Structures are given as C-alpha cells and as structure tokens.
Amino acid sequence: MELSQMSELMGLSVLLGLLALMATAAVARGWLRAGEERSGRPACQKANGFPPDKSSGSKKQKQYQRIRKEKPQQHNFTHRLLAAALKSHSGNISCMDFSSNGKYLATCADDRTIRIWSTKDFLQREHRSMRANVELDHATLVRFSPDCRAFIVWLANGDTLRVFKMTKREDGGYTFTATPEDFPKKHKAPVIDIGIANTGKFIMTASSDTTVLIWSLKGQVLSTINTNQMNNTHAAVSPCGRFVASCGFTPDVKVWEVCFGKKGEFQEVVRAFELKGHSAAVHSFAFSNDSRRMASVSKDGTWKLWDTDVEYKKKQDPYLLKTGRFEEAAGAAPCRLALSPNAQVLALASGSSIHLYNTRRGEKEECFERVHGECIANLSFDITGRFLASCGDRAVRLFHNTPGHRAMVEEMQGHLKRASNESTRQRLQQQLTQAQETLKSLGALKK
C-alpha cells in the first residue's frame, strides 16, 4: 500500500473516532437533562449531597432559584436610661426637630418620608407617628415653624427648600400639603443646616462652602453672609430669633444679628460677637433656650460654655464660663453637640457614642456607647430637658436626662440654704423632692 493511501486511511479513522466521541457526549448531556427534569435540581447538586426535590412545577422551581434580598438588620441597643426607641422609618434618619410647643418631634429619612411623633407617647409601649410623603425626592433637614402649623425641609435631589402645611383633621390627625412652589435654587454647595426664627420673620440656610442665606418666608433672599471660615460645619438660628451663628475650619464661632424695623421690614445683618478661645476648627455649637448661654466643641479636644448675655453694641465680649475635655473617636465624623434648655447639661456625640457633662463642674456623668449602627447624625434635647434624642440609623433613641435631674437637685439645695421666705422654701423643697424621686425611679440617685 502506498504512503498516500495509508495517510488517507489514518485520517478517516481519526475522523470516525471524533464523531463517535461527540455522539457519546451528546447522549450523556441528554441523560443529564433528563435527570434534572425528573428531580427539579441540577445533577451537580445531587452529586454534592442535596436531596432530590419531590415537588413539581416551574413555580416552585423559580421560588427555589430566586435569590432573596435580605433587609439590613436593625441595630440593637439597651441601657437602663433608654426611655424609648422610635422605629417607623425604613431608611436612615438624617435630621430631627422638636416643635416649640413641645408636642411633636419631626424626623426625616432617605425613605422619602417625614414622620411626626407625639411626645406624650414617648414613655408608652406604642409610639404613634404621622407620615408625610416627599414626592420623587427625600428630605435631609427638617424644622418646625414657630406656630407649629407647618415645617420646612431641604430636598436632597432638588437642592431646594420645600414648605409643608399641617392641617388638623376632625379625628385629631393632620393632613400634610406641600406648597405649590419650592424656594429658588441659590446655593452652589451642599446645604448642611436650615432654621426658622421663632419671630417668624426669616429662614436661614447654610451650605458647606462659606455661604449663609437669610430668606423671607416667601422665598426671597434678604441677605447673603460670607462667613470667611474656609468652610462651614454648622449653622443655627438662636432660640430668641435675633441671631444667626456659624462655625467651620477657623477656631471661632461667629454670630450675626438679623435686624428688622419697627414695622417688621428687613433692614440689615450685622456682626454681633464671636466666641474665641479654641485652638483648632470648631465642629459644632448650641444655644440655651433663652439664648444667654452657648456651648462649642472643637477639634482641639475641648468643649466650652459661654455667657453670651452681653451688650455687644458696646463692644462687650462673651465670657468663658467653663472648659472641659473629651476624647474624639478615631476616624469618626465631626462631633455633634446639644445643650440642655437651661444650659446645665452638655451632650457630645462622637462616632456612635454619646457623652453627657455637667457644665457647672465640667465632669462627665453618663456615657452611652454604640447607640446606633452608624455615626450619630443629630442630637437634641426636648424643650423640657427631660429627654435627649439621637439619630444615626433607622431609629431615634430617647434617653432620660439624669445629669439634668442631678443638676436640679444641686441647684435647689443651694437655693434652700439661702431662702428666707417660708413659701419660697416650700416651693424649692417640692422641686427638690420631685427631682430626687425621678432619679430614684431611674436608679440614678447618688447617695
């Protein structure tokens, strides 16, 4: 046989062999498919030890194969001084505000809702809330109007201010209606704070650059303030409604007065005074309820309490009353600060923990660790000073203000020693006994 004929025969043999292998593989694949159809599971899963599924039908097969998306677990926290946890939001809460009449707490979250909670339910098992929906957006900041008949929010995507009116229904609930038009867009950087003067004369918005805007209630910009602080970290309207303050990269807090005429017309914004004494950037500040005290917290590791009841027009500067130290959590967001209405207690939030200080002695009295699953976004005392509220995940947590009750005991004991009038002594003794009984019920009465 010639060499060429032998080569042709060998090639034919190889071709036939390949065809045979392909046929065998096809038969094997068909057998595997048949096995999968009979069992309802892939054959490889049988080999790995999964029991055969005796159920039939494509619906159950799809349910088995569908990957379920697990919801993030709610952070659990317990403490003997925890008064309540408000948990109706399905998204992270970024801001909250107590109404001036003390009846409500407003919260906003990235779940496109604002919740209005009844404060009288705080110590009940059930915590009722009313819901206002934010169409096609969500609110990052919320503030009640002075008359508690409306609230304003800052829209995350719209970058503007929206007003919601609250209309009371016959059943005692409220209907929430957004005004037809939002405020015009004016800020060029993200807005970090908003506020309304309790006089009802102006609204304040502050962005993370150096801009603070003063608005009329109708959405007209009355004044633009350049804080010259490199960047703003916090801004607020004083409870008295006269002042606007800001802090930022510089080691001071700047305060302006928003001036109006006798007929209520806007006149000007003038520099009032500054809080000077920190050696590094100021994270945050807060006013007491009467605006006569302010507190500040800085990157330098200190907090300070100030007497701001001064005649600034006569060039009188605020007085430093107390300086305290704190340890800032490593890698945490800038500290949040809240001052009790009577300025006797200062609360600092660093990371997910809260520290409470007696401002007269400068001593830390309480510490709540890992309160939220994320860094605390907002911190606030209610207007009575009974509770401290915090938010940082999908819940608001409310704490009994035991340092406030202890400060009340110390104050009443001091007044009793100096009181000469019997009726005054009886009134002071009644307040002292009430504060002591509250501490005793909370297991926080010091012997």
Curated annotation (Swiss-Prot):
Transmembrane segments: none annotated. GO terms for molecular function: phosphoprotein binding; protein kinase binding; RNA binding; translation initiation factor binding. GO terms for biological process: cellular response to glucose starvation; cellular response to hypoxia; endoplasmic reticulum unfolded protein response. InterPro entries: G-protein_beta_WD-40_rep (IPR020472), WBSCR13 (IPR042410), WD40/YVTN_repeat-like_dom_sf (IPR015943), WD40_repeat_dom_sf (IPR036322), WD40_rpt (IPR001680). There is a cross-link at K168 (Glycyl lysine isopeptide (Lys-Gly) (interchain with G-Cter in SUMO2)). The keyword Phosphoprotein applies. One of its GO terms (cellular component) is endoplasmic reticulum membrane. Keywords: Isopeptide bond, Phosphoprotein, Repeat, Ubl conjugation, WD repeat, Williams-Beuren syndrome. WD repeats lie at residues 88-127, 134-174, 186-226, 228-267, 277-316, 329-367, 371-409. Residues 38-72 are annotated as: Disordered. Residues 57-69 have a biased composition (Basic residues). Coiled coil: none annotated. The modification Phosphothreonine is found at T433. Pfam families: WD40. Disulfide bonds: none annotated. It comes from the Eukaryota. The keyword Ubl conjugation applies. It is linked to TBL2 is located in the Williams-Beuren syndrome (WBS) critical region. WBS results from a hemizygous deletion of several genes on chromosome 7q11.23, thought to arise as a consequence of unequal crossing over between highly homologous low-copy repeat sequences flanking the deleted region. Haploinsufficiency of TBL2 may be the cause of certain cardiovascular and musculo-skeletal abnormalities observed in the disease. This is Transducin beta-like protein 2. It comes from Homo sapiens (Human). The gene is TBL2.
